[in-house]
């Protein structure tokens, strides 16, 4: 190896690849009549790393996690919703078991089990789907059903969902075919009316019809790298029968539909069963009794419901559950903000009464867990704005009055005599 030295003849040495002289680089490595500099070595290493990344096949998990293992992992990130976790764990396990062993077992064709999640806003539907995909190490994408329209109309084509999934895995079709697709707001594409109309329902029943084949299983033709479709183009062929579809929605008003069905036939007169106010079922209890006929009455077409055989219901989160969500999961909101403050070298403390106040505020807003972040962000905004410009702050304390907007977080400085309250 030559390190910025001339060879025996006293000639100046140059890199055989980039042409730089030994004085322009840090190291020059000599071979038989050739030289390579440290910069070219680094560049070669980068090229090789990129090639390996592109060529290396996606490695599947050596063993499929059991329903118990899937459930335990969900427990680490999602508070409550135990019945839904159990249903999801079994459905996901059966889906990937079918993929690993082919679509048939001993000559028996195994059906596809897509999932329908019913639950109020902020109850954890999206989080459950995301956590599953992350745990199983499979591509995941989300779609909003309200943006979808039938092909040929202004809006998003249903096949764009598959294109998004392909983008998540660099257009690797094999990877995409093991992925999970979560379609949110599925209740918003319910049929607008029971009566046939002259005008076409392109964002309601029309979208349900368009999604049917995609969810059940078809070969979707997707243009490569997001190009527009044209006749001479070669398309990527994606088998959607191997993709797990999870559809979710709040289904506001479905509890009333279920209640009407349950109460129908209770009769009137002397033989009627009269229920007291205390016996009235809650919204969550009613949703757990959902039948296909209720979903049809709500506005989903029978064929669409048939493609979603696994139904899991999620309850509205209680105040206690929201407090748990704030502090217990691995990526709990309070832990996230504490990590953020730690980057400034400052400790962040949430008093218990502050957590209770945050939960009460979210309950009043009826936004579930989804509203927690905006409440915490609002309470800490001024502090996060001022903190990088301040010196000697060691600790920030958030109590109930901060959440109520009555005072600013308490700032504790390095010197005891310098305690002050942030403004």
Curated annotation (Swiss-Prot):
UniProt GO cellular component terms: HslUV protease complex
- Report which superkingdom the organism of origin falls in: Bacteria
Looking up SUPFAM superfamilies in the UniProt record yields: Glucocorticoid receptor-like (DNA-binding domain), P-loop containing nucleoside triphosphate hydrolases
The residues listed in the UniProt record as binding ATP, with positions renumbered to this chain, are 120-127
Q: Which GO BP terms apply?
A: cell division; proteolysis involved in protein catabolic process
Q: Does the keyword Nucleotide-binding apply?
A: yes
> Known InterPro entries for this protein?
AAA+_ATPase, ATP-dep_Clp_protease_ClpX, ATPase_AAA_core, Clp_ATPase_C, Clp_protease_ATP-bd_su_ClpX, ClpX_bact, P-loop_NTPase, Znf_CppX_C4
GO MF terms listed in the record are: ATP binding; ATP hydrolysis activity; ATP-dependent protein folding chaperone; protein dimerization activity; unfolded protein binding; zinc ion binding
Disulfide-bonded cysteine pairs: these are none
Q: Keywords in UniProt for this one? A: ATP-binding, Chaperone, Metal-binding, Nucleotide-binding, Zinc
Describe the location of the ClpX-type ZB domain by residue ranges.
2-56
Q: Where does Zn(2+) bind?
A: 15, 18, 37, 40
Q: Which family does it belong to?
A: Belongs to the ClpX chaperone family.
Q: What does the annotation say about its assembly with partners?
A: Component of the ClpX-ClpP complex. Forms a hexameric ring that, in the presence of ATP, binds to fourteen ClpP subunits assembled into a disk-like structure with a central cavity, resembling the structure of eukaryotic proteasomes.
| Its biological purpose | ATP-dependent specificity component of the Clp protease. It directs the protease to specific substrates. Can perform chaperone functions in the absence of ClpP.
Annotated protein name in UniProt: ATP-dependent Clp protease ATP-binding subunit ClpX
The species this protein was found in:
Yersinia enterocolitica serotype O:8 / biotype 1B (strain NCTC 13174 / 8081)
């Amino acid at each position: 190896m030559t390190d910025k030295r001339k060879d025996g003849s006293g000639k100046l040495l140059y890199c055989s690849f980039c042409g730089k002289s030994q004085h322009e680089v840090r190291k020059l490595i000599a071979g038989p009549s050739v030289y390579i500099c440290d910069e070219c070595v680094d560049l070669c290493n980068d090229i090789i790393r990129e090639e390996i990344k592109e060529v290396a096949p996606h490695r599947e998990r050596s063993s499929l996690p059991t329903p118990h293992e899937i459930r335990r992992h969900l427990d680490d990130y999602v508070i409550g919703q135990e019945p839904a976790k159990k249903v999801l764990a079994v459905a996901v396990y059966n889906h990937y078991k079918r993929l690993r062993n082919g679509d048939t077992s001993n000559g028996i064709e195994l059906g596809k089990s897509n999932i329908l999640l019913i639950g109020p806003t902020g109850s954890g539907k999206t989080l459950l789907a995301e956590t599953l995909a992350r745990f199983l190490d499979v591509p995941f994408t989300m779609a909003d059903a309200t943006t979808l329209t039938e092909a040929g109309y202004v809006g998003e084509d249903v096949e764009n969902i598959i294109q998004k999934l392909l983008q998540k895995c660099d257009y690797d079709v094999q990877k995409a075919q093991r992925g999970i697709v979560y379609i949110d707001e599925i209740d918003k594409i319910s049929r607008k009316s029971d009566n046939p109309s002259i005008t076409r329902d392109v964002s309601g029943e029309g979208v349900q019809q368009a999604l049917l084949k995609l969810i059940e299983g078809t070969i979707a033709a997707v243009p490569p790298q997001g190009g527009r479709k044209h006749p001479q183009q070669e398309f990527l062929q994606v088998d959607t029968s191997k993709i797990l579809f999870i559809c979710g929605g709040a289904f506001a008003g479905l509890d009333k539909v279920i209640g009407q069905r349950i109460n129908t036939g209770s009769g009137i007169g002397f033989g009627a069963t009269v229920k007291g106010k205390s016996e009235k079922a809650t919204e969550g209890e009613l949703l757990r009794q959902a039948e296909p006929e209720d979903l049809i009455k709500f506005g989903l077409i029978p064929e669409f419901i048939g493609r979603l055989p696994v139904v899991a219901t999620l309850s509205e989160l209680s105040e206690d559950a929201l407090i748990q969500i704030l502090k217990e999961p691995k990526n709990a909101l309070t832990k996230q903000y504490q990590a953020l403050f730690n980057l400034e070298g400052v400790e962040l403390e949430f008093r218990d009464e502050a957590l209770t106040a945050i939960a009460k505020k979210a309950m009043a807003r009826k936004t579930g867990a989804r509203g927690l972040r905006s409440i915490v962000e609002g309470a800490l905004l001024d502090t996060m704005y001022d903190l990088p410009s301040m010196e000697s702050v060691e600790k920030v304390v958030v109590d109930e009055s901060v959440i109520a907007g009555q005072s600013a977080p308490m700032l504790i400085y390095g010197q005891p005599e310098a305690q002050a309250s942030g403004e």
